Amino acid sequence: PMLNLIKGGGGALLQEKIVAAAANHMVVIADYTKEVSSLGAFDLPVEVVKFGSPSTKTAIEKVLKKLNYSKFEVRFRAQNSQKFVTDEQHFIIDLKLNKIKEPQLLHNHLIACPGVVETGLFVNLANTIVVGKSDGTCKVIRKERPS
């Protein structure tokens, strides 16, 4: 998926997005297990405020139906049989989508839901991605500069 990413699997996606947006140049370093042919192979985290979070979850499900996602799962992330709480004291709702068709469109619709703080979609934010391969070498992917 070129330089579009899903980040925030550890639950710090709001903080990661703030840093990425403030940076002049974003470099992402990942190992080969994170490289996929299309977004959606990994769950998409969505950070939501605690208050009204069940209603926010319902709104997210409506968005996915509106955007014609047919098979999906929407669930609160759990840790020790409790809802996972981020560093910013929010909940994470994980979306299992299998394939994300239009990442920017999906982000725009999700972020418009009351209660959604941020999504783990990093669309057009990364400038360079360094992927560590199993043989110890690296693959470097750079954003094309406009000519």
What are these regions (language model features)?
Residues 1-147:
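Conserved phosphate- and dinucleotide-binding cores of soluble alpha/beta proteins
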